[in-house]
């Protein structure tokens, strides 16, 4: 867990991260329940589309993730991918920016909670579609998909965003 503060010492956010080791396991016992999010059985309230820039992984590289899979085409081709993949923090940041623009535009300080599951890597150059269902006052569900192949596996799924509705 990490906490971020503004230059005047005001608390901005708390960041919790969890790693999922997909092919690890075998510890015995029952599997924990999946952290699933229920989506409303209706059309989404909002949709935001944007192309993920080819140079965005270079922008996120200074965040500390120096792995070759984000910038080295020859490396990623050896792993079976057609091109480098986006940083997870970048993909989540794009979804967060979309949510702010759609739900409480101009008031990023209103966000109190963002949670999502990374379910597929974003390839730079892909057109993203963030789909949002408002589920209550200051609460929404979202997922991010490939706008050109919306039936494919989502990039981000089980998304929750919450905000202080008194601010926005």
Model-derived regions: residue spans:
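HotDog/MaoC-like acyl-thioester-processing domains
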Residues: 1-48, 124, 131-168
């Amino acid at each position: 867990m990490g906490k971020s503060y503004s230059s005047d010492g005001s608390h901005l956010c708390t960041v919790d991260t969890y790693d999922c080791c997909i092919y690890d396991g075998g510890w015995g016992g029952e599997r924990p329940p999946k952290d699933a999010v229920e989506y409303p059985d209706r059309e989404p309230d909002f949709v935001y589309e944007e192309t993920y820039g080819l140079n965005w992984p270079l922008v996120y590289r200074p965040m500390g993730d120096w792995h070759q899979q984000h910038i080295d085409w020859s490396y990623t081709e050896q792993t079976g991918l057609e091109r480098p993949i986006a940083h997870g923090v970048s993909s989540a940041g794009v979804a967060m920016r979309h949510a702010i623009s759609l739900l409480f535009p101009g008031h990023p300080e209103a966000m109190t909670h963002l949670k999502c599951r990374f379910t597929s890597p974003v390839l730079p150059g892909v057109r993203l579609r963030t789909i949002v269902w408002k589920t209550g006052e200051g609460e929404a569900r979202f997922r991010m998909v490939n706008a050109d192949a919306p039936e494919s596996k989502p990039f981000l799924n089980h998304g929750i965003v919450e905000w202080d509705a008194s601010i926005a």
